[in-house]
Structures are given as structure tokens and as C-alpha cells.
Amino acid sequence: MHAYVYKSQRKQDTFVYLATRDDFSVIPADVQARLAPFAFVLDAALTPERRLAQADADTVRAALASHGFYLQLPKTVVLAGECDYD
């Protein structure tokens, strides 16, 4: 299975994987409104052996097969000073 990876031009560290190149119609309109425009990053073969930096390849393949896209959001890091311990 191939995935076409695009970077959101509006939200840092946010990527969309598509099953079909440039087929943004599979992405819900409200998601597109927040993240578009997108810039093409790479065409990747998602084999069972393939490792991805921020996502599980099996999860991405399943989402592409069922929905036609996978949304990769940035990791959230909570710093100790930002926590409310009360």
C-alpha cells in the first residue's frame, strides 16, 4: 500500500496521509478548514516492515483502507510547570 504524505501549512507538525494522491475530498470539510492548504512531502510504501517516525504503520494502513486518509497530529508535551497538582 502506498501513502501520500502532506504537511499542513497552517498547523505545525501536522500531517495527512492519503491513499490516493491529491484526493483531499476524503478529508472532512471541518478538518480541511483548519489545516489546508497542504504541501506534498513524500510518497511512501507502507509495508509491514516499514517504520514511521510518529505513527504506527499498521494503524495508518488501516485508516487509509477504511477512510482514505490518516491524520497525524503533533505530540503534546506537558511541562512540570504547566501541571496543576492541587
Swiss-Prot record:
Highest taxon of source = Bacteria
What the entry lists under Gene3D superfamilies is as follows: YcgL domain
Q: Which residues form a coiled coil?
A: none
Query: What are the residue boundaries of the YcgL domain, all occurrences included?
Result: 1-83
Q: What is this protein called?
A: YcgL domain-containing protein XCC3997
Q: What is the lineage of its organism?
A: Bacteria, Pseudomonadati, Pseudomonadota, Gammaproteobacteria, Lysobacterales
